[in-house]
Swiss-Prot record:
It comes from Maridesulfovibrio salexigens (strain ATCC 14822 / DSM 2638 / NCIMB 8403 / VKM B-1763). 5-amino-6-(D-ribitylamino)uracil binds at residues 25, 59-61, 83-85, 116. This is 6,7-dimethyl-8-ribityllumazine synthase. The keyword Transferase applies. The active site is at residue 91. It is an enzyme of class 2 (transferase). The lineage of its organism: Bacteria, Pseudomonadati, Thermodesulfobacteriota, Desulfovibrionia, Desulfovibrionales. The gene is ribH.
Length: 156
C-alpha cells in the first residue's frame, strides 16, 4: 500500500531463549497470566527448555530482577507478569508507576524486548477478566508483543 520497505516481526519463537518474571502477589491471577504466556510461546515454536520462570514477591521487585536477567545476556526477550489491585491507599499508584518505569528503563538500557503484562486493576473481577476470561489473557498479549518486537529488532 505504501510502496516502501516494511519490517514486521514474524510470530515464530523457535530457538529463542525467554525469561518470565512473575510476581507472587495475587498469584491466582498471575498464574493464569504465566500459563497463557508460556502456552502461547510454546505453540509458536519455543521449546520449554528455553523458557525460564523467575518468581518474585510482587510487582515492585520485578524491575530489579528483570535488570539482572537483561544484563546476563542469556535471553532474547523477557515477559513480566503481575497483578496489582487498587486498595484504599496510594500504594497502588506508586507500585504500578515504579514497576512500569523500571521495566521500560531496563528494556531501553539493554536493547532488549520486554513484554509488559502487569495488570493494574480496580477490582479482583477486572483482574480475572484480563487473565483469561472476558477480556482475553494479557499474559498472551505481553508474550506476543515481546516476540514480535524480538523479530523486528533482529531485522534492523
Amino acid at each position: 500500500m505504501y510502496h516502501i520497505k516494511t519490517i514486521e516481526g514474524q510470530l515464530d519463537s523457535k530457538g529463542l531463549k525467554i525469561a518470565f518474571v512473575a510476581g507472587r502477589f495475587n498469584d491466582i491471577i498471575v498464574d493464569r497470566l504465566v500459563g497463557g504466556a508460556v502456552d502461547y510461546l510454546a505453540r509458536h515454536g519455543c521449546e520449554k527448555e528455553n523458557m525460564t520462570l523467575i518468581k518474585v514477591p510482587g510487582a515492585f521487585e520485578i524491575p530489579v530482577v528483570t535488570k539482572k536477567l537483561a544484563e546476563s545476556g542469556k535471553y532474547d526477550g523477557i515477559v513480566v507478569l503481575g497483578a496489582v489491585i487498587r486498595g484504599a491507599t496510594p500504594h497502588f499508584d506508586y507500585v504500578c508507576n515504579e514497576c512500569a518505569k523500571g521495566v521500560a528503563q531496563v528494556s531501553l538500557d539493554n536493547d532488549l524486548p520486554i513484554g509488559f503484562g502487569l495488570l493494574t486493576c480496580d477490582t479482583i473481577d477486572q483482574a480475572v477478566e484480563r487473565a483469561g476470561s472476558k477480556a482475553g489473557n494479557k499474559g498472551v498479549e505481553a508474550a506476543s508483543a515481546m516476540l514480535e518486537t524480538v523479530r523486528v529488532m533482529q531485522q534492523i
